[in-house]
Design a protein with these regions (language model features):
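A generic fold-level signal
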Residues: 1, 12, 100-102, 161, ...
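Conserved beta-strand hairpin/beta-sheet module of binuclear metal-dependent hydrolase folds
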Residues: 1-45, 119-129
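Metallo-beta-lactamase
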Residues: 26, 104, 109, 115-189
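A short helix-to-beta-strand connector/capping loop
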Residues: 2-4, 87-88, 162
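Active-site HxH/HxHxD metal-binding segment of metal-dependent hydrolases
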Residues: 12, 26, 33-104, 137, ...
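Short secondary-structure boundary segments
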Residues: 31, 54, 78-79, 122, ...
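Hydrophobic residues at beta-strand termini and immediately following loops
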Residues: 9, 92, 110
Length: 189
């Protein structure tokens, strides 16, 4: 199996964008601006996917420029495409899998922060956008509430191994184990 590299790129609006490199292929999760910072991290790999965790501007501001530079396919959930008047080449849903350089990238739908919030699981690496942050949850969409988001985190994310690394859309990386121990939203009341 090929080697996996994960590069965190801090983009405008304090958004964490991630470049995943495996077997000569790449994916970008949450392409902020400037897109040139992301292109510079591709290291001769072919960009296959531009993946959006949710439709807020900072998390996809570089999508169109990155697509123009690379012709990669864009993917997001249809609920956020409709809610934020966005478009994508692929409308992703819970359980979808994308192949990337010999690895399987699994899509996990976690509505709460936005109706179409997605997380992406690659091996034991979980990219959570604003669904789960270190020590917190992302602010909920007006049409949802913290209980729905918390239910999705508990039922879809905390069933993963506790040693799963978590890469949120803002702030520092963490792990599911650390979040179970320290995140006040995840502790029993």
């Amino acid at each position: 199996m090929s080697k996996l590299s994960i590069v965190k790129v801090r983009t405008d609006k304090d958004v964490n964008s991630f470049v995943l490199l495996a077997g000569g292929e790449a994916a970008v999760i949450d392409p902020g601006e400037p897109a040139a910072k992301l292109v510079g991290q591709l290291d001769k790999s072919k960009l296959r996917y531009i993946l959006i965790t949710h439709g807020h501007p900072g998390h996809l501001a570089g999508k169109d420029a990155l697509k123009a530079a690379t012709a990669a396919e864009t993917g997001m959930h249809v609920a956020d495409a409709k809610a934020f008047l966005r478009s994508a080449d692929i409308y992703l849903k819970d359980g979808d899998e994308l192949e990337l350089g010999g690895f399987q990238l699994r899509v996990i739908h976690t509505p709460g922060h936005t109706p179409g919030s997605l997380c992406f699981l690659l091996g034991n690496h979980l990219f959570t956008g604003d669904t789960l942050l270190a020590g917190s949850l992302g602010k909920q969409a007006p049409e949802t509430d913290v209980r729905q988001q918390l239910y999705n985190v508990l039922s879809k994310l905390l069933v993963l191994p506790l040693n799963t690394a978590v890469y949120p859309g803002h702030g520092s990386a963490t792990s599911l184990e650390a979040e179970v121990r320290t995140n006040p939203y995840l502790r029993p009341r």
